[in-house]
Amino acid sequence: MSDIAERVKKIVAEQLGVKDEISNEASFVDDLGADSLDTVELVMALEEEFECEIPDEDAEKITTVQQAIDYIQSHT
């Protein structure tokens, strides 16, 4: 697993309080129980960790762990 993937999963686990193994295919809302506020906070945490800005229109498209990993890899 890449360093980015590990860091993204760590942030997801911390932000959403997930104790179990997080799969790359996991949906923030459907699988991990996030609500709209959780997803906003998650995006803010990713922006801070990776020192990047995720525009709202891009953030709306990031709904799974893998999409977050892919976005960070292509924008950092």
Swiss-Prot record:
UniProt GO molecular function: acyl binding; acyl carrier activity
Subcellular localization(s) per the UniProt record: Cytoplasm
Presence of the UniProt keyword Cell membrane in the record: no
Pathway the protein takes part in: Lipid metabolism; fatty acid biosynthesis
InterPro entries per record: ACP, ACP-like_sf, PP-bd_ACP, Ppantetheine_attach_site
Residue numbers of O-(pantetheine 4'-phosphoryl)serine PTMs: S36
Short name of one Pfam family: PP-binding
Primary location group: cytoplasm
Post-translational note: 4'-phosphopantetheine is transferred from CoA to a specific serine of apo-ACP by AcpS. This modification is essential for activity because fatty acids are bound in thioester linkage to the sulfhydryl of the prosthetic group.
Family in the record: Belongs to the acyl carrier protein (ACP) family.
HAMAP family per the UniProt record, alphabetical: Acyl_carrier
Function (record text): Carrier of the growing fatty acid chain in fatty acid biosynthesis.
Annotated protein name in UniProt: Acyl carrier protein
UniProt source species: Methylococcus capsulatus (strain ATCC 33009 / NCIMB 11132 / Bath)
Gene: acpP
